[in-house]
Structures are given as structure tokens and as C-alpha cells.
Amino acid sequence: MVSLPKDRMRQLEKRFEIIESQMAKNPDSGTYVKLASEYADLQPIVTSIRTLNALSIEITELETIISDKLTDVEMRNLAQEELPPLFQKMEKLEKELQILLLPKDITDEKSAIIEIRAGTGGSEAALFVGDLFRMYERYANAYNWKVEVISLNEGEVGGYKEIIATISGKGVFSKLKFESGVHRVQRVPETETSGRIHTSAATVAVLPEAEEIDIEIRPEDIRIDTMRASGAGGQHVNTTDSAVRITHIPTGIMVVQAEKSQHQNRARALQILRARLFDIEQKKAESERSASRKNQVGSGDRSERIRTYNFPQGRVTDHRINLTLYKLDRILEGDLDELINALISDYQTALLTEMDGNG
């Protein structure tokens, strides 16, 4: 039997009933939106609680029939046959409910900023950055998420030395947060005549997109410098200083944006800075909460090698959970769900183990 927090379950069910009652009273639109959002969050949990309660009653009734010596033998035998599948169903439902009741990461529902940078491997690393960006872009398209490139630095023979983009939609960060780290590729470059396999790497950083209410940036904590933005061949693309560099003085974090519009550069640089500062804050809080826990999916350290893409063998291996899939082509086309769901499941298992240990 799975241990479930009965008091909390009752509180959630009561809260759900209160929300239902308040929504039925036709509140103003602002209040209704807030209630509807909380209702949507609670509905799957409360549905599972009610199904589990009904199942528990059904099992109790069957056990009463079985234990009653006055009950017809055939009826008792029938009840005995019905019990095992109900116990199996109950066990499955309890595990699902246990996952639903796990503490929510407040950043999970947020959009994300993804930063991909070439590591070791020169031109091959830049090409690999291009492959990774297209992979995430196709994955995002499958979920109808919006992808917008904030800045890019193209490689000499293709791909990108660096590319930064926003991926907007509900729950983006919950799906992509385990992608942060070093991704390694093993393949034979097109220019390699001897057929020798080269190893290159790229670093991925996935940050929850932060709103102004999430993180405050005080004007006195930043220094904004402007400079001329250069176009192709080093020519100035306009006559004004349009490139923007923002330095966060307390942390030393620096963000540069060099598109044509100075106003847009400033806004986007602040957007990236806000996300990086929020990410630091979240990681510090998580570190304090779980100093004793070592999650199997890894620490989220961006220097940690998390995954290898081996072209000759057509395989992708995630080193954090020792999962190898022989479908490299499909994964690079954006078929990431099997990998991502396995990482989420592993993380949830680690959380449950921690909760059991604390309990």
C-alpha cells in the first residue's frame, strides 16, 4: 500500500468544492480567471481522490461479503474473484495520485529561454549547435509552442557558435528543464577523408522566463553601455549606437544584444538578464532545500556531460539515467518525449524516495 497524506487530500477536495461554488456565482472576469486556473490544477487531483475513495468503498463491501459466513458460497466466491483486479487498480491509482501530490515547481508552467553554445570541436561543434536548435524547434512545434530567436552568432561553415531563443507556451520549462548541460556528438565530418570519428560538444542552458514580478532589477545595480552594431563585412548597419551591453554589477553577469533596434536590444538584454538572475535565485533555493538529496537526473550543472549523440551507431545515450535509444534520426527530428518523460519520471522517483525517507 502506498502512503498518502489523507488530511491534505481532504483539504484539497474541500478547496475544490469552494472554488466550484464561487465560480457558479458569476464573479468578475479577473476573479473568474484566477479561480478557473486553480480549478484546472486541482481537477485531476480531486478526480483521482474521488475515484480512489469509490474504489475503497467497493473493496470494503466485497471484503464484507467474503467475511460474512451467512452469505451464499457462490456469492462469496464471486466477490473473491473480483478483489485482485480492484487491488491492482487501487495500487496503480495510488501511485498516480502520489505523483500528482508531489510539491509543484513554481517555474514548471513558465515559458523558457534556451541558450545553446558551441564547445570543443570548432566548426563541427557549431554545426551540432544548429542540429540541437532544430531539434528543440521541432519539438516545440509539436506542442504548438512559439519559438523566437533573440540572438545568434553563425558558424563559419554553418550552424551557430551561439544561439539564444525564447520558447513560449504553457509548461515549456517543465519539459525542457532537464536539457541543461553538455551534449556530446560523435560523427564523421563531411570533410574527413579517412572516415575518422570526431567528438564535439555543445552546452545547453534552459532558463525559466522571468517576469518583472519574479525578479527585481534595481536601476543602480546595472550599467548600460551602447556601441555601434556592425553588419556584414564589418559595415555599420545604421548611424546610431544600437548595440547594447548590460552589466549586472552585483553578480558581474553581462548580456550583449546587437540587433538594429536599440530599444529592442535593451528590452531583450533585460529579458535575458532577468532570466539568468531568476535562475540563479531558483537554483540557490533548490540547493538549500535539497542539500542532502542527490537527484539521479543530475544537478543541472551546465558543465555536466548529460547526453551523447552517436551517429555511426544511430544511438542517443542519456548518462544521468543510463538510457540508450537507437533512434537518433527521430530524436533529432524532435521526437524527444521518450527521453524527456524518462527524465521526469526519474526525478519524481527521487522526490518520492526523499519524501519516504523524511517520513
UniProtKB/Swiss-Prot annotation:
Methylated by PrmC. Methylation increases the termination efficiency of RF1. It comes from Bartonella quintana (strain Toulouse) (Rochalimaea quintana). GO terms for cellular component: cytoplasm. GO terms for molecular function: translation release factor activity, codon specific. The keyword Cytoplasm applies. Keywords: Cytoplasm, Methylation, Protein biosynthesis. NCBIfam families: prfA, PRK00591.1. Belongs to the prokaryotic/mitochondrial release factor family. Residues 284-311 are annotated as: Disordered. It comes from the Bacteria. Peptide chain release factor 1 directs the termination of translation in response to the peptide chain termination codons UAG and UAA. This is Peptide chain release factor 1. The keyword Transmembrane helix does not apply. The modification N5-methylglutamine is found at residue 235. PROSITE patterns: RF_PROK_I. Pfam families: PCRF, RF-1. It is found in: Cytoplasm. InterPro entries: PCRF (IPR005139), Pep_chain_release_fac_I (IPR000352), Pep_chain_release_fac_I_sf (IPR045853), Prokaryotic/Mito_RF (IPR050057), RF-1 (IPR004373).
